[in-house]
Amino acid sequence: MAVQQVKKSRSKRDMRRSHDSLTNPTLSTDKSTGELHLRHHVSPNGFYKGRKVVDTKSED
C-alpha cells in the first residue's frame, strides 16, 4: 500500500475539497405555459424561449 512522504496539511486538504460542493439546479419559468424547466433546456411540452421547437405527441 502506498504511503505518503509528507503529510498534507489541513489547509491543502481543504483547498482541494473547495470544489466538491453541490449546487441545486437552476429552474426557469416558461413564458408561454408557466411551467418550470431547466435553464437552456426544452420544456417537456416542446417549448424553448416561448417558441414551439419540438413536436410532441397529442393525447387522443
Curated annotation (Swiss-Prot):
A Gene Ontology biological process term: translation
Biased composition (Basic residues): 7-16
Keywords: Ribonucleoprotein, Ribosomal protein
Domain of life: Bacteria
Keyword Ribosomal protein attributed: yes
Region Disordered, annotated ranges: 1-60
Polar residues biased stretches: 22-31
A UniProt-annotated Pfam family: Ribosomal_L32p
One Gene Ontology molecular-function label: structural constituent of ribosome
One GO cellular component term: large ribosomal subunit
Protein's UniProt keywords contain Ligase: no
InterPro entries per UniProt: Ribosomal_bL32, Ribosomal_bL32_bact, Ribosomal_zn-bd
Family: Belongs to the bacterial ribosomal protein bL32 family.
Protein name, as recorded: Large ribosomal subunit protein bL32
The species this protein was found in: Francisella tularensis subsp. holarctica (strain LVS)
Gene name in the database record: rpmF
